[in-house]
């Protein structure tokens, strides 16, 4: 069947759910689709569909591992929504998922209040540059005491402020995602309030349309008879059919031509900043491109191994290391969708870095990746985030 052309009528915004495991992120995503589908603004999807790629834990729960993309509309906008994994082990995916957000919906269970991963996700949202967080206080139907809800709300505001979000004025919507799925009026009303909140609170992103095209590769697959498709979110610029592009990072830079562009299984003649697209690349083998490389306008970005960076090392209370590290420390660095091992070299006269410190260091990666000044990254070790940083200068 011929694919429908994608209609651009409303402004397009990327959002996503973040928060602690079992606080209701995926249930909220399902409830938004359920409520909006009743108005003809979304296609309904079940919890199990959204949590696809999850590993089943018991009869009712799925640990959401895969980042799941869904789409829906409000009265004003078209949203692409990523359901981000909440489990601590999968923060790595959270880093690639949160990178796709113009704003985040932080889901907090009223019964539990903020938990360790709530904190970690807010920090990561700050590091990957999510500009605005709207809060959905979920499961309020389980709490009879309004004072308790006020306390939880206060705690959330303090936490947002701690990580440089506007906690004082943050929009906090109280509701029950399950009640919304079941079609209960108070459940649906909360989802409507949330839709209004994301419409007004999450700024329409200043798309970086005029900059040279760049997309970080998230996934690669081959389509029989057509060639290799690379998927990801266009970070900046515009790509059109038959544009020449470069594949940069992890191996020698190569050049190719874009022979197809699609979004949500519909064909486009161009993709622009903020779109999640698949690009069909001429003459590229499935093995010729991998996650973590970038596809970019020719000569617009180059691969580098060495840089200076300002880093913040999480304190023990924030879930970071308990002990200092020394010159020559070798963690993983997460850039866009790439994880690369590298070495941290401390400034002269500095013997060690303590948890809670922030400091300027030199980093050297084992593979060259597409890198530029002001780019953010996370520092990971043994499956958890221990710090975050920003490139201040490219060395070589």
From Swiss-Prot:
Belongs to the TRAFAC class translation factor GTPase superfamily. Classic translation factor GTPase family. EF-Tu/EF-1A subfamily. The keyword Protein biosynthesis applies. Its main location: cytoplasm. The gene is tuf. The keyword Cytoplasm applies. It comes from Opitutus terrae (strain DSM 11246 / JCM 15787 / PB90-1). Monomer. This is Elongation factor Tu. GTP binds at residues 19-26, 83-87, 138-141. Residues 138-141 are annotated as: G4. It comes from the Bacteria. The lineage of its organism: Bacteria, Pseudomonadati, Verrucomicrobiota, Opitutia, Opitutales. Residues 19-26 are annotated as: G1.
């Amino acid at each position: 069947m011929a694919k429908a052309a994608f209609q651009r009528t409303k402004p397009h915004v990327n959002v996503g759910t973040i928060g602690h495991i079992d606080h209701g992120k995926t249930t909220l995503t399902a409830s938004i689709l359920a409520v909006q589908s009743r108005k003809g603004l979304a296609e309904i999807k079940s919890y199990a569909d959204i949590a696809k790629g999850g590993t089943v834990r018991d009869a009712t729960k799925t640990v959401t591992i895969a980042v799941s993309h869904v789409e829906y509309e409000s009265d004003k906008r078209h949203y692409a929504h990523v359901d981000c994994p909440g489990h601590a082990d999968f923060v790595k995916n959270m880093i690639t998922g949160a990178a796709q957000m113009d704003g985040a919906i932080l889901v907090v269970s009223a019964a539990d209040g903020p938990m360790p991963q709530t904190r970690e996700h807010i920090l990561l949202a700050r590091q990957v540059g999510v500009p605005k967080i709207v809060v959905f206080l979920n499961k309020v139907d389980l709490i009879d005491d309004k004072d308790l809800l006020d306390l939880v709300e206060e705690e959330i505001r303090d936490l947002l402020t701690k990580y440089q979000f506007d906690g004082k004025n943050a929009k906090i919507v109280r509701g029950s995602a399950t009640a919304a799925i079941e079609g209960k009026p108070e459940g649906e009303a909360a989802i409507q309030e949330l839709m209004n909140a994301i419409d007004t609170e999450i700024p329409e992103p200043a798309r970086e349309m005029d900059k040279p095209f760049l997309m970080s590769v998230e996934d690669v697959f081959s389509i029989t008879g057509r060639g290799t498709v690379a998927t990801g979110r266009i970070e900046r610029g515009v790509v059109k059919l038959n544009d020449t592009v470069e594949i940069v990072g992890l191996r020698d830079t190569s050049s190719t031509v874009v022979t197809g562009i699609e979004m949500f299984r519909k064909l486009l003649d161009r993709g622009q900043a903020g779109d999640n697209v698949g690009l069909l690349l001429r003459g590229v083998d499935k093995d010729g491109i991998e996650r973590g490389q970038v596809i970019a306008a020719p000569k617009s970005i180059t691969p580098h191994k060495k840089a200076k960076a300002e880093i913040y090392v999480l304190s023990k209370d924030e879930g970071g290391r308990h002990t200092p590290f020394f010159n020559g420390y070798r963690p993983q660095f997460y850039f866009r969708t790439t994880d690369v091992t590298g070495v941290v070299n401390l400034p002269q006269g500095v013997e060690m870095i303590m948890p809670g410190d922030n400091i300027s260091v030199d980093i050297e990666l084992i593979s060259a990746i597409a890198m530029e000044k002001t780019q953010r990254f996370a520092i990971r070790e043994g499956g958890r985030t221990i710090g975050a940083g920003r490139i201040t200068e490219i060395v070589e």
